[in-house]
Amino acid sequence: MTQPIDDGQVLLVEEEKTKLFKAITLRQAWYDTPCTPESFVHVIGEFSQTGQCVIDDHHNMLILHPDHLISATVVADSFGCLRRAVLQDRVKATSRANAPMLYGTLLHELFQEALKANTWDTEFLLDTIDRLLPGKFETILEINSTCEEVKEHMKSKLPELQSWAKIFVTAKPRADGLVRERNGQQSLMSINKLLDVEEHVWSPMYGLKGNIDATVQVTMQDDQGERTLTVPFEVKTGKNSSNAAHVAQTALYNLLLSNRYGKVTLLAFLERY
């Protein structure tokens, strides 16, 4: 049951296990949460001894229908346009292939194969490209290209891929393995173990699901010392490394993995075309 008040909306809820009634006050951005008498909600936060909980822009969270898992990608896409995110999820339309899309997909798959094998030498990478190309033959024809042209383009990307791996795929952080967080803090980082590839993660706590490119173990060194963390690793290709949807998606994946593994951090590899 909901009851509007001057500075928010009050939900009278029944806790599933204890059958006790409690009150949740929704304020600010949470005020318009479309709760109905039959809604299931999950509260991430604390209740007072009298059974009161205030949810606003700074305190606590409410997940509406957490049993209906929504793709983290769909949620992230909604930051740009709510309608677009819904339409993309419901209408599985396909657009014409283009060269950046093809090269981005190939780079994504090549990176994953190299990460799985922990092998970054030129011979292995070229052999992997040769194995990937037959599966992209129709797309190559659609963009009026040839396998030879596509392979040459991918060969031009190998030096920077190998340079990145030399710096970051190591047992211990190197002096040049510097990463900068969004708050400006700097750390040294190394990827020292691959835990999973294309990991499917479901989180009824947050009502989210996701398919994470790779889950890796990293070592971080900063002013607080050395830490070993389990992190989601997302391979992003495109023109805009500050894309709001990319940032939102990686933040949501961080939530998903924190639910499974505990405290984690986040990193992403970006390639521009």
Q: Where in this protein do the model-derived segments appear?
A:
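Mg2+/Mn2+-dependent nuclease catalytic core
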Residues: D6-V41, M189-Y273
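Accessory interdomain/linker segments of ATP-dependent helicases and helicase-like nucleic-acid enzymes
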Residues: M1-Q9, K151-M154, L158
